[in-house]
């Protein structure tokens, strides 16, 4: 998966840009990805740190509350290329967060990736793990690759 970008740049006000790993690849139309996530309870996300993939903002941002949207949520930023790529993670507010950084959080990229893998697998899509060589402290360097499989066995 060498041709797929490996990093998303996150720009926070007052902070240096940071890199989040690409951990989601779908060989599906963006609209189909969005439909599957919406059917699982995800909604559009307007609250987001500015993010770019190769200089472009995401075409789709979604979130799913796990425990109150501002305490713990699943979060996705997706870009359309000839395929859909992006980052999915579980955000959790840091226990010691205080004003003015009340919403300072940590992101678990593996938990988010694994959650969406299960969502798509449960709907009959094919799932593979693809090594992206983009490890971080909270990420093992793998992306989930989602594709259409013979779904007739599910109908």
What are the roles of these predicted feature ranges?
Residues 33, 37-41, 120:
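Hydrophobic, Leu/Ile/Phe/Ala-enriched alpha-helical segments that form helix-helix packing faces
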Residues 41-47:
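Short secondary-structure junctions
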Residues 48-155:
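A cross-kingdom signal targeting lumenal/periplasmic-facing segments of multi-pass membrane
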